[in-house]
């Protein structure tokens, strides 16, 4: 008899209901409720408790594992944006160290920029833009970084991870590296392609890394390549022609090219100085209405034009004799390139190369609207770049923004890689005094030296 009772009890504890609890646990909970309430109609209350299940039991919460360790780390990093940073502990006493006072900085309305882009159906979405706003706040308040201004540049997609890019200026001028002798000097900090310092992170809220300065050679080499980013800054750039640097340098060159071509402002919002080309806000600027801002003629390039030399201001070689005028063809076409004037309108941009069968080449910019109805008032309008897919400029009233979200690949015609260099001749010139024009083999110095034979061991 005792064995039968034990088997029955084990059966009740083993059988699970659809909610995950056993029959034994359900009966025990029902009896406990009857004994606790002690109702007059105990039998009916017991039947009701057994047949009905609590609302919480109907909600099964399965444990959903993270897709990968990187996804879990990204979720933790993004969650850290919504709370106070963890205090730094003193290694000797173990007590928290008083944090530094927040750094004072200026930034654009990142959340408002997200609303403008949402109106056009582009961008990252409100949830991700809100996290980008918190990341901008954290970067700007970091006293160790010492930034003066912060702007959210956009997002680059990668095969293994993505890049979130932040454009900043520093409160103090950093030390600039010197260009190697015989190369085109890079532009100093605060000017041209090195006017801003860029920080990137793979996740919003994750660790930030400062990108290096860009050189003219890196910009010129990046124009010959078309490749995807991996998401690892230390990854090598395996391509031909060889790129002088790793993926961090390649990403920085892409940012320089994209910012010079797609960061725009409404026409007339800034005025340029005739001598220094420095921009200043125009207090008399009157914003245009809705759909008028979808015309490229009403937008201007905000950053300086990037010339073929890889600089915004061309660098000319010094003539051999400074007292005499150089020859007519002493300077190359790159050194003589003038470029468009500051704040050139977008309608002056060259169209894209026409594809096979196209009678008219596609324009460099296309209009985008928040509504297909012309009568919609106060709607957001802007332009979208066809040369750099993913670059969008939006405007509503006095609020405008420019952002890039893409793969970092330039459009425009069919692309073919550069042909390999001509093969190196295996035979040298005929040596003097050799009869019959016999050619001698050239000694190759690239091979490692021949190893010495091993020493014989004494038996």
From Swiss-Prot:
Residues 309-330, 418-459 are annotated as: Disordered. Its main location: cytoplasm. It holds the Pfam family Radial_spoke. CDD domains: DD_CrRSP4-like. One of its GO terms (biological process) is cilium assembly. Keywords: Cell projection, Cilium, Cytoplasm, Cytoskeleton, Flagellum, Methylation. The keyword Cell division does not apply. It is found in: Cytoplasm, Cytoskeleton, Flagellum axoneme. The modification Asymmetric dimethylarginine is found at residues 267, 398. Asymmetrically dimethylated at Arg-267 and Arg-398 during flagellum resorption. Probably methylated by PRMT1. One of its GO terms (cellular component) is radial spoke head. The keyword Cytoplasm applies. The radial spoke head is made of five different polypeptides (RSP1, RSP4, RSP6, RSP9, and RSP10). Belongs to the flagellar radial spoke RSP4/6 family. Flagellar radial spokes contribute to the regulation of dynein arm activity and thus the pattern of flagellar bending. They consist of a thin stalk, which is attached to the a subfiber of the outer doublet microtubule, and a bulbous head, which is attached to the stalk and appears to interact with the projections from the central pair of microtubules. This is Flagellar radial spoke protein 6. The lineage of its organism: Eukaryota, Viridiplantae, Chlorophyta, core chlorophytes, Chlorophyceae.
């Amino acid at each position: 008899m005792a064995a039968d009772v034990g088997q029955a009890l084990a059966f009740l504890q083993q059988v699970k209901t659809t909610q995950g609890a056993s029959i034994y646990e359900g009966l025990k909970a029902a009896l406990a409720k009857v004994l606790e309430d002690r109702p007059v109609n105990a039998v009916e209350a017991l039947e009701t408790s057994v047949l009905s299940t609590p609302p919480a039991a109907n909600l099964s919460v399965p444990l959903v594992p993270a897709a990968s360790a990187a996804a879990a780390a990204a979720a933790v990093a993004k969650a850290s944006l919504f709370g106070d940073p963890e205090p730094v502990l003193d290694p000797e006493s173990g007590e928290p160290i008083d944090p530094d006072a927040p750094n004072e900085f200026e930034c654009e309305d990142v959340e408002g920029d997200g609303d403008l882009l949402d109106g056009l159906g582009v961008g990252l979405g409100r949830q991700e833009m809100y996290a980008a706003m918190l990341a901008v706040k954290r970067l700007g308040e970091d006293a160790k970084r010492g930034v003066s201004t912060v702007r959210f540049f956009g997002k680059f997609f990668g095969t293994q991870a993505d890049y979130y890019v932040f454009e900043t200026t520093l409160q103090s001028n950093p030390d600039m590296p010197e260009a190697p002798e015989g190369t085109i000097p890079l532009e100093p900090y605060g000017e041209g392609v090195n006017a801003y310092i860029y920080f990137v992170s793979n996740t919003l809220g994750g660790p930030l890394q400062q990108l290096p300065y860009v050189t003219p050679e890196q910009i010129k080499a990046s124009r010959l390549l078309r490749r995807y980013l991996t998401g690892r800054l230390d990854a090598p750039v395996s391509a031909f022609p060889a790129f002088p640097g790793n993926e961090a340098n390649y990403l920085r060159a892409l940012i320089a090219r994209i910012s010079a071509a797609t960061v725009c402002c409404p026409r007339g919002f800034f005025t340029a100085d005739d001598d220094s080309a420095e921009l200043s806000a125009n207090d008399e600027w009157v914003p245009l209405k809705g759909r008028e801002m979808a015309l490229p003629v009403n937008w201007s390039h905000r950053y300086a034009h990037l010339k073929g030399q890889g600089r915004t201001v061309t660098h000319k070689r010094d003539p051999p004799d400074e007292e005499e005028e150089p020859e007519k063809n002493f300077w190359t076409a790159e050194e003589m390139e003038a470029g468009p004037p500051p704040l050139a309108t977008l309608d002056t941009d060259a169209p894209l190369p026409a594809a096979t069968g196209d009678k008219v080449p596609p324009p460099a910019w296309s209009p985008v609207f928040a509504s297909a109805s012309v009568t919609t008032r106060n709607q957001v309008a802007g332009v979208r770049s066809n040369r750099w897919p993913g670059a969008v400029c939006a405007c509503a009233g006095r609020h405008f923004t420019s952002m890039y979200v893409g793969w970092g690949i330039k459009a425009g015609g069919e692309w073919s890689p550069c042909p390999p260099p001509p093969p190196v001749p295996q035979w040298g010139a005929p040596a003097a005094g050799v009869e019959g024009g016999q050619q001698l083999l050239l000694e190759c110095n690239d091979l490692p030296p021949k190893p010495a034979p091993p020493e014989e061991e004494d038996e």
